[in-house]
């Protein structure tokens, strides 16, 4: 008897516990009845907000979905501009579930990773299409805001009309039950091979400028050296000229004095000349002269000094 009561109580307790479910903050719940999403009389999906809710046990199952905004990084990829130039674009998008029923059905039971795979594919296609309409200058400078705005609008609405050009796309985000909240471009770079080529060209240009400046510097240095050498030559020539003039004036003055003194004291003049001759003759101790002592050269040596 006790076992039967316990079994009955356990059964009702199981039914009672299966009749309620809790939806947490940042989540939403939908009811599946025999594998189909439960709708109201207006054929709108019943979405359960955070709180405690009732369901029919065994016949209805609850699927909890994340209602928060998600950030999805789009791996840096190569894109071609209007000018047929390649760019490496690194971007990300923010998204959230806008239609929980459609999201559940489109992603195979609310598979988050499947949703991001589909979203990345659509986002990459749309971004590629938009970049293909712009040139590099527009993308890098004033049109980055317009670019992301156009991508955001086209992802959510499916079509955009700019400059009378219609870019048609299937309502893929609506089909997934997803709303793209924001689109951002983190970084725009040139491909590595292009960057290397630009760097090499810039380096070659800088080296050419450096060589030109060094050549100009060497040319100026040569001109300065030549000018300095010329001025030195002029200064030396002028100095030598003045020295010769001074020397000539001195010799003339000496000759004048000698002539004047020679006329007055000729013996003293010859005496001085003999002393100079003695000095020059015996300057080198290795010199040997064989001269008769009665020679005129020794005239003043043989003369006795008288007080």
From Swiss-Prot:
It is a single-pass membrane protein. The keyword rRNA-binding does not apply. Its main location: membrane. The chain crosses the membrane at residues 3-23. One of its GO terms (cellular component) is membrane. InterPro entries: Band_7, Band_7/SPFH_dom_sf, HflC. Keywords: Membrane, Transmembrane, Transmembrane helix. It is found in: Membrane. It comes from the Bacteria. Gene3D superfamilies: Band 7 domain. It holds the Pfam family Band_7. The keyword Membrane applies. HflC and HflK could regulate a protease. Belongs to the band 7/mec-2 family. HflC subfamily. This is Protein HflC. The gene is hflC.
